[in-house]
Amino acid sequence: KSGSQLGRGEPVADTARVLNRMAYGVVWRTFGQGRVEEMAKYSTHPVVNALTDDFHPCQILADFQTIAEHRGGVDNLKNQTIAYLGDAANNMANSYLLGGAVAGMDVRVAGPYGYLPRPDIVADAKRIAAETGGSILVTTDAKEAVKDADCVFTDTWVSMGEEAEYAIRSKPFWDYQVNTELMALAKPDALFQHCLPAYRGKEVTAEVIDGPQSVVWDEAENRLHAQKALLTWLTGKARGDESLLA
């Protein structure tokens, strides 16, 4: 439960107006995407979505930084083929679709029927990809998604707050487990990433997460560096400090 006045029901707009007088920005992890957007609407300073049910952009920054480190720099993100497997309706899948499209990547998302991304998010991703030279594929075929991919991603099959439903919710996802057989379909130098924490033996096997293609520990470290860079840039923007925007 929130320790702020939001926890007792204060309107988001009122909280935003108070924080405008106290801070250069807001970093908020919450459930409803609309709440973050309302905070941004009434804030005079930057608002960072630290995670919602719909999106997890801060994680994507770290993930793409990790790819850049292993692929020779940010300029080489364009036209990388990335594949996400599992719950393709969750915030990570949505974020890979939109973030990958912005970066000009070829994005493939695979999940079972009933767990595919919303049509409006797919449409937005395709529109952006058409402008950046990327591409979007949504499929129920894990092998199709992973074929010749440069990087394979997955996430837990059960999101925060749904742990009690694990046995039921996990049933549709076993065909999307990232294992050595599936990784063999990707490029020989393909990377494996997981935003962590992972359920070993569920969405990913120990052989993969501990194997030579796994860069999950680099990815975890980059959550620190990517967010430091984001806050530095946003703080400089809020203060009008051009030296922090370079």
Q: Which residues are covered by each model-predicted region?
A:
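Short, well-ordered alpha-helix to beta-strand connector turns
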Residues: 23, 43, 148-149, 212
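Hydrophobic/aromatic ligand-binding patch that stacks against planar heteroaromatic rings
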Residues: 18, 39, 99, 182, ...
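Short, conserved loop/helix-junction motifs that constitute active-site signature segments
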Residues: 76-77, 101, 181-189, 211
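Phosphate/diphosphate ligand-binding glycine-rich loop within oxidoreductases
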Residues: 1-68, 200
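Glycine-rich phosphate/diphosphate-binding loop of Rossmann-like nucleotide-binding domains
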Residues: 69-154
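Adenosine-phosphate binding glycine-rich loop
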Residues: 189-190, 195-246
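Rossmann-like adenosine-cofactor binding region
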Residues: 126-207
